[in-house]
Amino acid sequence: MSDKPNAVSSHTTPDVPEVAATPELSTGICAGDYRAALRRHPAGVTVVTLDSGTGPVGFTATSFSSVSLEPPLVSFNIAETSSSINALKAAESLVIHLLGEHQQRLAQRFAGSADQRFADESLWAVLDTGEPVLHGTPSWMRVKVDQLIPVGDHTLVIGLVTRVHAEEDDESAAAPLLYHEGKYYRPTPLGQ
């Protein structure tokens, strides 16, 4: 037990670090335990970009997933508190960039301050359809926003893929960038 006032002890298991107690969620589970469990799940890193009508908007997302092959649908979600949420809700289309291991700084840039995301104009260009596209990304997809579904404190975005681009040069063909336990990683194959 801690000597600090209002401290609450949490349970631990031998292989899991102790998580600071936090308020319970509506289901009765501890928010800190829930976050700790999700941190154990690695995710691919994407950057979503779009044209807001008044300039480019973008953000890092690790919730990207394929939904359907026919029609080609993908999804990701965004917090209702995101600085990009209003522009996203107004957008008809966007670009989802699947980042490579060489793009950790780009992932960090788009997870940081909104006013710095597009500050370096050498990192991006504009497609003929108006969306910003990032240079050197292993692959990206132009997506027409199909559905915006409010889910809890997030919005689930379902998009119809209208264009796919894959880079062929050696650097862009690198392994994907992963996010796990608050850090960036590259995948390595397991022994066969």
Curated annotation (Swiss-Prot):
CC annotations in GO: cytoplasm
Compartments reported by the entry: Cytoplasm
Gene3D superfamilies referenced in this protein's UniProt entry, alphabetically: Electron Transport, Fmn-binding Protein, Chain A
Function: An NADH:FMN oxidoreductase which supplies reduced FMN for the '4S' desulfurization pathway that removes covalently bound sulfur from dibenzothiophene (DBT) without breaking carbon-carbon bonds. Provides DszA and DszC (DBTO2-monooxygenase and DBT-monooxygenase respectively) with reduced flavin (FMN).
EC number(s) per entry: 1.5.1.42
Gene Ontology BP annotations: dibenzothiophene catabolic process; pyrimidine nucleobase catabolic process
Broad enzyme group: oxidoreductase
Primary localization: cytoplasm
Family the UniProt entry places it in: Belongs to the non-flavoprotein flavin reductase family.
Location of the region described as Disordered in the Swiss-Prot/TrEMBL record: 1-20
Protein name as catalogued: NADH:FMN oxidoreductase
Gene: dszD
Entry keyword Flavoprotein: yes
Catalytic activity: FMNH2 + NAD(+) = FMN + NADH + 2 H(+)
